[in-house]
Amino acid sequence: VTNLLAAPIELPRVKLSANWMAACGEPGEDAALYETVKAVGMELCPALGISIPVGKDSLSMRTQWSEGGETKKVPSPVSLIVSAFATLADVRGTLTPQLDNTMDDTTLVLIDLGKGRHRMGGSVLAQVLGQGGGEVPDLDEAQDLISLVHAVNILRAEGKILAYHDRSDGGLLAAAAEMAFAGHVGVALNVD
């Protein structure tokens, strides 16, 4: 959903397409899938006022082979791949990630829905650093996302946001770099 915020979305218009993946039949996997469906489909989506009208499931996520006369098997962990989409009344209010250095006294602001927890489990960075596990990013309070959508829409309407980029695909440094590339500018960050 944060990827969509560059556009003037309204949460009730947001829909999700969900691909639920699990190695059903493996110990604990059916229960883990149920907990995932419950958390997303029965708790988070209703709290946000959004729905999942489309999707698919892949419930045999395992591989099995024979090696040296022994059967080996690797089940995939429960995974959920989500795409979000929304209809817009007018696309002209959509922001780009392009930083603009022609204006004086602008500030690049990080809004941290993770509340300083820096959860990186499963990220590419964690994998590169050999720390693939750990706590994964999560939305602790649905109201935080609702408030963010509301605030961004108000600030956009008031002309107070010049550019937008979420940090879900690589974190703060990747977002800042992509914004600088888009604007053909350099950037100096002071992270307090």
Each model region followed by its residue ranges:
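Glycine-rich anion-binding loops of enzyme active sites
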Residues: K15-G116
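Alpha-helical support elements that line or immediately flank enzyme active sites
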Residues: V1-L5
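Long, low-charge, small-residue-enriched segments that form tightly packed helices used
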Residues: L139-Q143
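Glycine-/charge-enriched secondary-structure boundary and capping motifs
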Residues: D30, A39-V40, L44, L48, ...
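Short, well-ordered loop/turn and helix-capping segments at boundaries between secondary-structure elements
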Residues: A6, T87, I111-G114, E178-V185
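Short, solvent-exposed amphipathic alpha-helical segments in soluble enzyme
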Residues: P97-T102, L125-V128, A176-A182
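Gly-rich Lys/Arg/Thr-decorated short loops/hinges at beta-loop-alpha junctions or inter-strand turns
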Residues: S79, M120-D138
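Glycine-rich phosphate/pyrophosphate-binding loops
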Residues: A7-L16
